[in-house]
Design a protein with these regions (language model features):
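Electrostatic, structured charged patches in enzyme active sites and in nucleic-acid/phosphate-binding
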Residues: 1-149
Length: 149
């Protein structure tokens, strides 16, 4: 059960007709799930104060178009953004990279991490890592597949 306001806001926006329409019209396949950090062993490692930590984003999306799949992690944040910088910095290791499974060299996988909420108080360096609340549909419309060079 989802009880955190920022997650509830995200799910409400996801359920809007225009957001669903954007997903259905722009991807051959899409699915999403809430990540449960107590059940799922799905995390992004990062360092904070020289200690290794585990970041469990709240939601994961699988978006496929043709031979490319985007694995998109979205982590809604409330009005007080805390500790996102270290998590965003850890994601930079994957940002812009395209992965190819050994058993299917024509298939491409791209990993995306975004935070969701009001990005007015977010530092300039991290603004591109955020989806502005009430702009989720636009994010899915503008999310581009990286072509392998």
């Amino acid at each position: 059960m989802v009880k955190v306001k920022s997650e509830i806001d995200f799910l409400k926006e996801l359920q809007e007709t225009e957001t669903i329409k954007a997903l259905q019209e722009n991807y051959d396949f899409w699915a999403f799930s809430k990540i449960d950090e107590h059940l799922d062993n799905l995390f992004i490692p990062y360092f904070n104060n020289a200690a290794e930590r585990r970041f469990f984003p709240d939601f994961i999306f699988w978006l496929q178009k043709g031979g490319t799949q985007i694995i998109c992690f979205i982590d809604p944040k409330g009005s007080k953004h805390t500790d996102y910088e270290h998590k965003a910095d850890a994601y930079k290791l994957f940002k812009g990279k395209v992965f190819t499974p050994k058993d299917n060299p024509h298939f491409k996988i791209q990993v995306v991490l975004k935070f969701y909420g009001n990005k007015d108080d977010v530092g300039e360096k991290y603004r591109d890592d955020w989806i502005q609340k009430d702009k989720l549909k636009d994010f899915f419309l503008k999310l581009s597949l990286i072509e392998r060079g």
